[in-house]
Amino acid sequence: MAWSQSARKPMIGLLFRAQQHSARGYSYSAFQAHLSSSNVDQSATLLRRFSSEVPASEQMNLIKQLRERTSAPIKDVKASLVSCNWDIDVAQKDLRKRGVVLAAKKSSRTAAEGLLAIAQDEKRAAVVELNCETDFVARNDVFQYLASSLAKLALSARDPGELVFPFGPDYLENLNVNLDHPKLSGETTVQSAVTEVAAMVGENVKFRRGFIMSTTAHGVVCSYMHTCPQPGLGRLAGLITLEAEDSNAPLDALQRVGKSIAMHIVATKPLFLSKELVSASAVENERDILRTQAESSGKSQMAMEKMVEGRLRKYFEEVVLLEQKYVVNDSTNIKSVLNDLSKEVGSKVTVGNFARMEVGEGVSKA
């Protein structure tokens, strides 16, 4: 065999040098240490010689193929191929093992970038947030595919039986997901899929949260995604359910107006649906702030009270959806838009629920 023949000459040389060292008074232990060191050097030389037997053009081709299969960094791809004697299948398994270890090491790093993904049918919509460390990874097709897959899984999971159902990672992480992407395929758990993608992209990747919104039999779920790299993905999401009292009301009109209001929600960030739903403590806190501001004006008590009430109305216009000026036409408000829609469909239309979500909100980036 070529290996044993190529190793024979260096061994003869080693024995010859050992005899010389012995004649010069070297100890047995010193000779052993020298021999062990020389053997390691010779083995490394043989491995390099074996690796170099793969032509440079074929090495580049193997690196390209493994890079396409895994999306791993080129330096890691080459290192695995070299350590696995350029066997691409063995190297792919080696890369996966390395990636899982590296992903675990990076799991404590802040992941405040990423994407929202939405999946919906006529009566329900599911939104999930998948985080990473940089917007560069958020543009990665494997990352985007995983985000979309998680949204579809959330929508197909058991019906929670609630009109609005927020959930954390534990709701999905142990469920199986079927993946069909050139670089990410097969059936695995959500937790394993997230770890595998983290290994591919070289960043901390986390499934953070999500929610499911449902409507009644005579309603629609409407959504809007902002800054979309592709349909169903974005950095901001607005959702709203509109419900008609009459079951014969045309739902396409509700969808048309509802989508526009969902866009409005993304732009204006409402906190409450109606004035009645603003907590008494929130109103009183705002009133105290406005009263303190009015006192510095030096006006009479009656004038200051009028100032406070006027500014309180302005506060409601800022945080209450029904009182907000419509971004599409600021000469009217959302309440008037719904009144006009009710006349159009011949049935009273009301808002069931609404939600707004943004990537990374509430995550400390320090």
From Swiss-Prot:
The keyword Nucleotide-binding does not apply. Signal peptide: none annotated. Keywords: Elongation factor, Mitochondrion, Protein biosynthesis, Transit peptide. GO terms for molecular function: translation elongation factor activity. It is found in: Mitochondrion. GO terms for biological process: mitochondrial translational elongation. Residues 1-50 form a transit peptide. Pfam families: EF_TS. The keyword Repressor does not apply. InterPro entries: EF-Ts_dimer_sf, Transl_elong_EFTs/EF1B, Transl_elong_EFTs/EF1B_dimer, Transl_elong_Ts_CS, UBA-like_sf. One of its GO terms (cellular component) is mitochondrion. SUPFAM superfamilies: Elongation factor Ts (EF-Ts), dimerisation domain, UBA-like. Its main location: mitochondrion. Associates with the EF-Tu.GDP complex and induces the exchange of GDP to GTP. It remains bound to the aminoacyl-tRNA.EF-Tu.GTP complex up to the GTP hydrolysis stage on the ribosome. Belongs to the EF-Ts family. This is Elongation factor Ts, mitochondrial. It comes from Oryza sativa subsp. japonica (Rice).
